């Protein structure tokens, strides 16, 4: 009991850095500032909601920059996705400025902080913080949040022909959704049934889009991939006729993913010989782009906004494929 923490708003987070931030706020002078380097998850994941509420209610003007761990790390030997926040004690101004997700190669590390760019970022639509880095991202976000979360379309009797199939592990830059069962058994394989009046293939196409990758990147910690993250994606399902092109693209994506899949065996001491499959989704990039072009009609994005979405993170997602 001597090491027990009592009376902290952030107790439910069970995280020492959350307690440290709350205590630091208590010790701050009205005109003082504070800055720390902490994991991205502090601003992104639902498990840190009490800390996020503290940031939004108890601090003043805030600057948050975000740094991925690949291809290079913020500090050598520290393989973590990190955020740096600088803020004041609460006052009449409670504006939040953010960067996008910063990635860089080792040889450009010395220019990293000189090139940081912040934008005033809307943070009223969700308890966590979104990582927006430019005005065009803010414009896209403000259109995107007008739509319905996919979780509203979940339910009904188990129907394997109208379900979403996905994995909650692996994938890296390329998270994959299928219209039918995976070709191998894995504890991370999951499926969710969609209501019968909604065509699951339309949702699958939307989840396989570049827009979904942007949504996932700006909202979460880029490590965990949980159901609440997936089904929080906002997409307004209208009717089958108006979404016919998206449904056809979903079939094309399914064929492409399975055609380009790599099958191999893993022999481990604990589990023995197992068959597994990797879906080379980067080879389906043209279909992804076509899906985003169709989604533009749903979200009413401009051509400039569509171009941003299609090319979001492309330098690091495609890598050498861009040079082929």
Name each region found by the language model:
Residues 113-152, 162, 239-324:
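Non-catalytic DNA-recognition/assembly elements of restriction-modification systems
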Residues 84-88, 193, 234:
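Short, well-ordered beta-strand micro-motif
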Residues 1-159, 177, 183-188, 223-226:
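Signature of N6-adenine DNA methyltransferases within the class I
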Residues 147-184, 190-199, 209-211:
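Polyanion-binding interface signature
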Residues 23-31, 40, 54, 58, ...:
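Generic, well-ordered alpha-helical scaffold segments in large soluble proteins
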Residues 37, 65-67, 87-88, 167-169, ...:
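Generic beta-strand/beta-sheet core signal
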Residues 95-96, 174-178, 201-202, 308:
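Short helix/loop capping segments that flank catalytic or ligand/cofactor-binding pockets
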Residues 191-232, 239-259:
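Basic, amphipathic alpha-helical recognition segments used for DNA target recognition
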